[in-house]
Amino acid sequence: MLNNLGANVLGPKDCDLPKAALTALHAGVNSFGQLPVGPNLADLGGGAGGGGSSGGVPVGGGVARLHISGGLCDNSNALNGGNGSSGNGNGNNNNGNGNNNNSMQQQDQKRHRTRFTPAQLNELERCFSKTHYPDIFMREEIAMRIGLTESRVQVWFQNRRAKWKKRKKTTNVFRTPGALLPSHGLPPFGANITNIAMGDGLCGTGMFGGDRWSVGVNPMTAGFGQLNQSSPLSSSLNSGLNSGINMGSALGAGSYQHYGLNALGDSMMYQHSVGGVSCGPSGSPSATTPPNMNSCSSVTPPPLSAQPNSSQNELNGEPMPLHQQQQQQTHQHQQQQTHQHHPMAPPTPTQQQQQLPQSMQSPSDGANDTLHSIAALRRRASELNAIPSYLQMAPHNYEHYNSNSNSVY
């Protein structure tokens, strides 16, 4: 009853047949999948009747089931479906094989990196030193000699030429003088130093000049030699400068700066304070005399005579005698007195040169009395006020040094 209710309510099931009907169905199926009509139906009816004792199934229902089940449970359809699935699987396998073949071809097309041996590199470098652009015959010869292909040799030469051009460009930039510097630049060291410092009218030639310093020549010695030739300084200043430079080279830069440059700076600043005195081609002072020559003449002689001598004595290690200091002071006051007696007649440069050695050789005896007079001291103070401060320090330093040396000896 339950089977009949299920069959009537739910409808026929696929392949819901007894075992005997299934065996008869499989045995009686022809090549086209059609069921025979005659005896098979009787057998099916008998089989269905045998089961009908517990509730038989009419023959028509069995036929309908067979018809539906025959269309659904056909072996040929199952076989065809199986063949179709296998065909799809074969297609997938073929596609996979094709992809593998393509990947192998790509790997074959990809070039392997060539590793050159040292012997091959030496041969290639030797050929590159001969020519940078070898022809096809030379490349083939090189390839046969080192065991490479002509294309590899050609590529190596291309890379080597590119490297050579890049290296040449960088080396040219660093080797070219002034390539990395601005175009205008700065003037060379020592060019026209005296013209810049003291003016073109004071001294015509440069201290160091524009030429390069040669090997083995002291540049400071050469510069001071040119300056001494072109300046109107005395021979004592010349010897003082040379001895100062020699002692500086022997004792060090500190003593050289203390002696040589101080003497040079003091004497030049005295010369510059005179004004109007300029260097001619022969090294003698010109004949032009400024209107304030009377006030400057009493200041000019001490640096030209006293200071170089004192600096020379200091360089030689000898203390300056006391009578020389007295002679210098008396000479100064004597000149002051002469200028007071003759204010309207300024001496010419030749007369000044003649008066200088006479006053040094024969100092007057009465000058010691005027040294202590109040008027002379006032004039001395006014003169010292007229002299710049950096020039006033030089005589005091010399007197302090002489006093110390006298106390030692």
Swiss-Prot record:
Listed Pfam families: Homeodomain
PROSITE patterns per UniProt: HOMEOBOX_1, HOMEOBOX_2, OAR
Gene Ontology cellular-component terms listed: nucleus
Motif (OAR): 372-385
Compositional bias per record (Gly residues), positions renumbered to this chain: 81-90
Tissue expression as described in the entry: First appears at gastrulation in the ectodermal proctodeum and later in the hindgut, anal plate, and along the CNS.
SUPFAM superfamilies according to UniProt: Homeodomain-like (SSF46689)
UniProt keyword terms in alphabetical order: Developmental protein, DNA-binding, Homeobox, Nucleus
InterPro entries, sorted: HD, Homeobox_CS, Homeodomain-like_sf, HTH_motif, OAR_dom, OTP_Homeobox
Function as written in the Swiss-Prot or TrEMBL entry: May be involved in the development of the central nervous system.
Name of the protein in its database record: Homeobox protein orthopedia
Organism: Drosophila melanogaster (Fruit fly)
Organism phylogeny: Eukaryota, Metazoa, Ecdysozoa, Arthropoda, Hexapoda
Gene, per the UniProt record: otp
